[in-house]
Every structure is written in structure tokens, then in C-alpha cells.
Amino acid sequence: MLCLPVFIILLLLASPAASNPLEKRIQSDLIRAALEDADTKNDPRLLGLVTGACCAVLKFSFCCGKK
């Protein structure tokens, strides 16, 4: 009678659904870092250089803002 509950508890502990604390901490750190990266702002100088190079070298109208 006592064997079945002990077997069930051991099965639950060994199952893949039992989370590893280290893995859980790494996942939460990665999620937090991704959210911080998503919140960064673009540097207007860098965007100006890219659009300027696109307009000067490639002469695409959508880069220069001309219609």
C-alpha cells in the first residue's frame, strides 16, 4: 500500500515537468535581458548615416524621402 504513493512521488520528481531551479533562473535572466534589449532606442545619428549612404550611393527614393 505504501509503495504506490512513494512510486508516484518519485515519478513526479523525475519527470521532465519538474523544473530545474538553475534552468528556471537562466530562462528568467534571458527573458529579462530580451525585454531590456527590446526597450533600447535607435541612435538618430546612426540612422542618419544609413539613410545618407542609401541616398548617396544607391539613390533609392525611399531612402531620401523623395516621392
From Swiss-Prot:
Which domain of life does the UniProt lineage start with?
A: Eukaryota
Q: Which GO terms describe its molecular function?
A: toxin activity
InterPro entries membership: T-conotoxin
Positions of the pro-segment in this chain: 20-45
Tissue expression? Expressed by the venom duct.
Question: Can you supply one Gene Ontology CC term for this chain's record?
Answer: extracellular region
Q: Where in the cell is it found?
A: Secreted
Q: What is this protein called?
A: Conotoxin ArMLCL-012
Q: Which organism is it from?
A: Conus arenatus (Sand-dusted cone)
